[in-house]
Structures are given as C-alpha cells and as structure tokens.
Amino acid sequence: MEMQRLPVEVITYILSFLPIADRKEASLVNHTWYFAAQDSLRQENILYNIPATSSSLATIESLARRRVSCVSLTSLDSSTVSRDVIQAVSCHLGPHLQSLCLRGSSLTETSFMHLLLACPCLSSLDLSGCNSLFMSGTLLSKPETIGQAQRALTNLQELNLASLRYLSDLSFNRLTGCAPRLARLSLARCHLTFGFDPYRGSSNYNSSALLSFRNLLRFLKERASSFRALDLSGTSITSPAMRSLVQVEGLCLQELVLQNCRDLSNEAISLLCTHQPHLTALDLTGCSELSDQAALAVSAGLRALQSLCLGKLQRLTDRGFLGIAELRSLQRLDLSECSLVSGSELVKVCSAPELRPNLASLSFAFCCLLRDSSVLSLARSLSPSLRVLDLSSCVSITNVSIQAIASHLPRLTVLRLAWCKELTDWGLLGIEERNHHREKDAGPQFSRNFGNMGFFLPPLQNLEQDPKVLSDSASNESRKQHRASLQALEQLQELDLMACSKLTDCSITKVIRFPALRRLSLSLLPELTDASLVAVARGCQSLERLSMSHCGKLTDKGFIEAASSLRRLQHLVISGCSQLTGQTLEAISRECRQLKSLDVSMCHGISMADIALFQAQLPLQTCVQSRFVGGADLSFTL
C-alpha cells in the first residue's frame, strides 16, 4: 500500500512514537501527513506560546485550523496590539481552549473578561503575576459578570494565582466561587496572613485588603471532597496553620508544594504525614528548619509517595533515609544542595532488589559528599528504571562515575554533569587513564600528620575500601567489565557538561553523537575548537538548544560549516566567544530559520551593524541578547 493512501488515523498512530520535533518535520510531507501530525500534537496537549505582537495575528488564524487546546499569551498589556491579539484568540481559538496561561501579563479587566467569556471549555487557568487584574479590587464585582464567569469556568479544575500581591479574600472568593470543580490551586508567594484572626471571630470573610489563611481554610472545608493539590510555596505558613490545614475533615490531598516555607518544623511535617497519608507528591525544597526527623516521618507515613523533593535542606543527613525503603512507589527523588548527604543509605536500600524503589529521576546536584563509589553502586542498582540523573557540581566524582553511568544506565534521557571538573577525556571515551603521576612520584613522601613525621607510600584509592557501599566481588566484577564510552547512552535527550574544563576535542568529537539529543551545554570548555562544534552539529542534528558560551577558540569557520546541520536549533548561546564576527550571524540567519533566541553578549568581534542585519533576515519573534557587543551595553528584542 502506498504511504500516501494510508488512513490519517494510522499515520497519526505511527507519528505518536516520534519526538515532537520529528512530527513537525513529518507534517511537511503532504496534506495527509500534515493533518496526522496535527492530530498527534493535539493529543499531547502541546503548549503554544503566542507573544502580543502584530505578527502573531496570522499565526493565531493558522492555529485555529489545528484546533489547539493549550495556549500561553505573553507580554499582554493595554496596548492596541494586545487588544487585537486578545480579540483574535477569542474569535479563533477560544471555543477549543482547555488551558490558558496569562502569566505576568498586564491586561485590563475588560480584556480579561472578553477573553474569558470566549473560552467555555477551560480546565486550567494561569493568572500568576497578573497584578493589574487585582489592583483595583473590582474584578467580578458586578452580578452580570459573575454569572458570565460561572458559565465560562464551570469546568475549571486548575487555577494558578501565584505571586499576586493584590489578591484579597474578596477577589479570591469571587473567582473561586465561579469554579465549582476546582481541584488544584496555587497561592505560591502570595501575602497570606497567618497567626491572627483579622475578622475577630466573624465568619464573613470578605476583606478587600488582605488574604487570610482563615478564608483559605473555609474554602478547603467547602471543597474538601474534591480538592487534590495545593501550592503554598514562599508563604509564611506556620506549624499551627499546617496542623489546621491537614486536619480539615474530608480533605485528601494528593500533591502539596511547600517550597521555601522557612517556618515549618519537623513536628508540622509529622502531622502532615499522619493526616494526609495519600499524598503522591511532596515538595519541601528550601524548608530550612527541617532535618532528619522530617525525612523519617515522610518515609514512615507516606507510603504512596511517587515524587519527593528535599532540596536545600542543610540539616538533612544520610540518617534521614533509614526508612526510605518504605517508599516502594517512589519514582522521583531530589536531594540537590543537601550538603550533608553522601547517598550511603540510599545505596544500601537500592542494593537490595526487594527493597529498592523504581526511581526514574534522581538529583544529587551540589552534594559535595557524593563519591564515585556511591555513583557506581546506584548506577548498577537503578539500571532498569533510571531516566534522569543530575550530578551537577558534585565536585568529587571522577571518570569512574561517568564510566559507571555509561556502562549501567543506557536508558538515560537526561544527564547533567556541570562543574564536575575532575572529568576528563579518558572518562568520556571509556578508556582507563594511565596514572603517570603515580608512576613518577611513587617514592616515599612526608606524611600529613605533623605529629608523627615520617615517610609512607600513598595508598591506592580503590572503591573496595568502603564495604558499606561496594563489596569486593562487585568492585572486581565492575573492573573486569569492558568500560563503555558516553556514546553508549543512545537515548540521551539532554546533556550538560558545562565547566568540565578538562574536556577537549579529543573526546567531544568522538562521543557526542546522539540522534535524539535536544539540549546540549558545552559552555566554559576553553579547549574546544571548531572541530568539536562541527562534530556536534553533524552528530546531533535534532539539537534545539545549544550553549557554547566562553569557548574562546571557536571561529567563524566552525559556524559556517556547522550551521547547515543545525536546522532545528531554536536557542543558541555563544556569549563570550571573542573570535566570532558577523560571518557567524550570517551563517546562522541563513541556515537556522527556526531560531527563537540568540545570545552574543561579550562577542567583541560582532558589531551593532551585524546585529541589525541579522534582525532583518530572521523572523520577528527572535530575541537577541547583545550586551557589551561592539562596546555597547544593549539588549535587543527583535
């Protein structure tokens, strides 16, 4: 059967196995493939970002034919252009929209109501940072507008009101009162008042001057049976307030985000785990008063937990993970910036197949106590499930870790190793480095103990020295196994090697060949030359984001040769590359037609005239950062 005669439904099913970028390319084959690709994209609920510019009007009409359901409008204000964009969205996209994001917009109440009433199928609405809407306090103050809003928001399930400095009890009640099916709410970084009763015992919570926790409790009591997710990040919620919240009768939360709630205590978290045992996602990042006791309470009380974020807890140690084996459903664990965590307890749990969780995402970013031995053990244990691994700024890990990752984690899609300065070309290539330093300096040396001056031979640093982490047999088996190069991670979609300053062309040109790679950072690698740039471009032709800032040896010749292989590139950062000139911009504008943002800051060889010419050749939505270019301190938005 000829491919063009296949039913659209069959082609749609085939395309569903491809990445989004590949589906976009497939849509250019013919009309049938175009409609099939649009169907598959619509099923993924792809979010379309639409800036408030005159050039967006034609785009909106085009999106209407695709019946898109998720839209984010940016840079809206009271200008005529913004009103035209709102009118176009209301007319062409409104009837089909299910998700609408207006984050940070400065639109008027009239424009908002006009847009809202044109979207009767909304299930998600993001008004975070839209302070102009709430400044006057008159939003939804008229009976007729309330009735219209109720009809428009009858299916709304998710509402984001984060970072609204003028949100009050009155405006909160008006807005949530129009959404009877609301199940998810964000009040992150709002000025909630805790600890006192501004109403002095009255139950008439309608202040136009403040947003009170008592009013939030009233709302939760009314919606307890259907409410599922709450975000109070960046608020001053106290332990007594947490007690009142988790004990609301009938409330069964599934997700709770409490980032940077610095007044929460271990006791508050214990109460949370006791009264909300059905939580599947908990984020306690930056709750600085929490310690091991809180982590132990989570392990003991939240057996259904799938996502746990404990980043930036400076009091958390490995002891807090003694009970982590109880979290059998855990899929995501974030321990970034926990400076006292080495991962030893997690290693013990993961070493036992009957105890280890099926972790898909693990972050040890900025955990300076993490060692190669722990990485090796975790890589072996989590091989079947792990897809995302973040070891950024784990300054103690070496080539042993990268070779363990390449050998045992072939299904990784995201790997972040930024600022791991001990990584070398040998590690990426999977070759054992000859220790010339040891052979040269193997003679006697002074001991470090000045109280017992003498001579000794420095002991060899073997992984077998830590029996808690890796047994002798396991270590020997690993050493006998053929070392894999980084190229073994064939499914990588994101790779960050920023500031791994010992890496050179020797490894980059040979191993950075990933057909599915979409994001790559090679910034602050001073030894990289045009050879690496060309090799990366040819080996990673699906790249959408590339960062090579402060790679001082890159020249125009490299970009002229590489640009034709980077046709899908959308974001490029080459700031601080001092040898680049306008020829690089000419090559990029000619070949990288999908580019959305470019950073050429501190590229002294590029002039403002070059940028003006680049502006004329690329689509208007491209943003160019050009600080300190040609001696100027300017930032162009084209």
Predicted regions and their residues:
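Acidic, serine/threonine- and proline-enriched intrinsically disordered linkers and terminal tails
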Residues: 193-210, 430-489
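P-loop/Walker A phosphate-binding loop and immediately adjacent motor/lid segment at beta-alpha junctions
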Residues: 148-155, 201-208, 223-226, 353-359, ...
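Short loop/beta submotifs within extracellular cysteine-rich repeat domains
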Residues: 167, 182-184, 193-194, 238, ...
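Conserved positional slot within leucine-rich repeat
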Residues: 72-75, 101, 126, 160, ...
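C-terminal interaction modules of eukaryotic adaptor/scaffold proteins
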Residues: 546, 568-638
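Inter-repeat linker/turn residues at the boundaries of leucine-rich repeats
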Residues: 31, 66, 95, 117-120, ...
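N-terminal adaptor-interaction module of cullin-RING ubiquitin ligase components
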Residues: 1-248, 253-260, 265, 269-273, ...
